[in-house]
UniProtKB/Swiss-Prot annotation:
Keyword set, alphabetical order: Chaperone, Cytoplasm, Nickel, Nickel insertion
Family according to the record: Belongs to the UreE family.
Main location: cytoplasm
Molecular function as annotated in GO: nickel cation binding; unfolded protein binding
One Pfam family from the record: UreE_N
Biological process terms in GO annotation: protein folding; protein-containing complex assembly; urea metabolic process
Lineage, highest ranks first: Bacteria, Pseudomonadati, Pseudomonadota, Gammaproteobacteria, Moraxellales
Protein name listed in UniProt: Urease accessory protein UreE
Annotated localization: Cytoplasm
Species this protein is from: Acinetobacter baylyi (strain ATCC 33305 / BD413 / ADP1)
């Protein structure tokens, strides 16, 4: 079984690769198993550096490359008659800290009948659909600078 252990920021334009569709739940994990469309089983043991976004590339130590795509999955789609109503729904869903995908004309979240009823109570339309899920990463998402303490120069000489 091939084990993918590296995340790649980019690949050469002439590089060949296979593709694999994964749900959002799987793309959040650093370790998983999956089956390619040709029936080959693979494993992933990746650095814990955040979610695999659709279009991300991972590689084995031997140089095999795999592009990860978002797999369509069951989601709740919220639509509204006005932009303001949609904005209001996004506010209320955001207050519940659920993964939420925003588009200009709809909001998407993982199936949850309590949240669906809340949004319907605000006067919006909710229906279950199959759609790829790429929720917003949020203000506190993983980013690339170091938060370790840096040495502080002493203002006073200490004995």
């Amino acid at each position: 079984m091939k084990i993918y252990t590296q995340r790649l920021d980019e690949i050469a334009s002439d590089q060949t690769f296979e593709t694999l569709e994964l749900t959002f739940d799987t793309r959040q994990k650093s370790r998983f198993r999956a089956t390619l469309t040709n029936g080959t089983d693979i494993g992933a043991d990746l650095p814990r550096t955040g979610i695999l976004r659709s279009g991300s590339f991972i590689a084995t130590n031997e140089g095999d490359i795999l592009r990860i795509d978002a797999k369509p999955e069951q989601l709740m789609q919220v639509t509204a008659k006005t932009d303001f109503e949609l904005l209001k729904a996004a506010y209320h869903l955001g207050n519940r800290h659920v993964p939420l995908m925003l588009t200009p004309y709809a909001l998407y979240f993982e199936p949850d009948h309590v949240l669906a009823e809340m949004v319907e109570g605000l006067g919006l339309q909710v229906k279950q659909v199959e759609h790829a899920f790429e929720p917003e990463s949020g203000a506190y998402a993983q980013h690339n600078h170091d938060h370790r303490l840096s040495p502080i120069k002493s203002l006073h000489h200490v004995h």
